[in-house]
């Protein structure tokens, strides 16, 4: 039994959900999101909530049960509140700024890195060493943050690089004489 899957997902006021064929669409104040539905799980919209139940008791159906319920919850949270991630840049001369549809990163390379901002994602730079990524799709926000971080991961000796806000970097001791 999935403890997560048992709980129905409540649909708040101002949000509409509809099942059309094998697609669940959710529309809210921030936009519209949709996912394709799994065949192993049945979905029902009733009384302002969406319930997810496995069709049979196979291991595959039970494993999809909790995951699909969480994906539905992510859709509803995305269209009501949205998601955001914050990256911090550490290092001498390392900086970032938004220029039009591109994020320009100076990360100690011989050239600047231009990162094209994808559709549906908003990137802001409150200061030169902070990058805020926000959007309504949780997966897309996390993927963009990971792609930006990949350009210069934090190194363990001085901690230079791009890290998530609140991320702990395990520091190593340097050479000894």
UniProtKB/Swiss-Prot annotation:
InterPro entries: Ribosomal_uL6-like, Ribosomal_uL6-like_a/b-dom_sf, Ribosomal_uL6_a/b-dom, Ribosomal_uL6_bac-type, Ribosomal_uL6_CS. GO terms for cellular component: cytosolic large ribosomal subunit. The keyword RNA-binding applies. GO terms for molecular function: rRNA binding; structural constituent of ribosome. PROSITE patterns: RIBOSOMAL_L6_1 (PS00525). One of its GO terms (biological process) is cytoplasmic translation. It comes from the Bacteria. Keywords: Ribonucleoprotein, Ribosomal protein, RNA-binding, rRNA-binding. NCBIfam families: L6_bact. This protein binds to the 23S rRNA, and is important in its secondary structure. It is located near the subunit interface in the base of the L7/L12 stalk, and near the tRNA binding site of the peptidyltransferase center. Part of the 50S ribosomal subunit. Belongs to the universal ribosomal protein uL6 family. This is Large ribosomal subunit protein uL6. It comes from Rhizorhabdus wittichii (strain DSM 6014 / CCUG 31198 / JCM 15750 / NBRC 105917 / EY 4224 / RW1) (Sphingomonas wittichii).
């Amino acid at each position: 039994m999935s403890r997560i899957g048992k709980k129905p997902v409540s649909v708040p006021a101002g949000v509409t959900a509809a099942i059309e064929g094998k697609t669940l669409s959710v529309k809210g104040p921030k936009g519209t999101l949709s996912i394709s539905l799994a065949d192993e799980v049945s979905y029902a919209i009733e009384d302002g909530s969406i319930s997810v139940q496995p069709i049979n008791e196979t291991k595959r159906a039970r494993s999809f049960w909790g995951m699909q319920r969480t994906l539905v919850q992510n859709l509803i949270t995305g269209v009501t509140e949205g998601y955001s991630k914050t990256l911090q840049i550490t290092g001498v001369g390392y900086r970032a700024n938004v220029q039009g549809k591109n994020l320009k990163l100076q990360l100690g390379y011989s050239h600047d890195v231009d990162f094209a901002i994808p559709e549906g994602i908003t990137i802001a730079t409150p200061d030169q060493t902070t990058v805020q990524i926000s959007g309504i799709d949780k997966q897309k926000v996390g993927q963009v943050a990971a792609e930006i971080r990949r350009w210069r991961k934090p190194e363990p000796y001085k901690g230079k690089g791009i890290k998530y806000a609140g991320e702990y970097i395990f520091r190593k001791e340097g050479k000894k004489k």
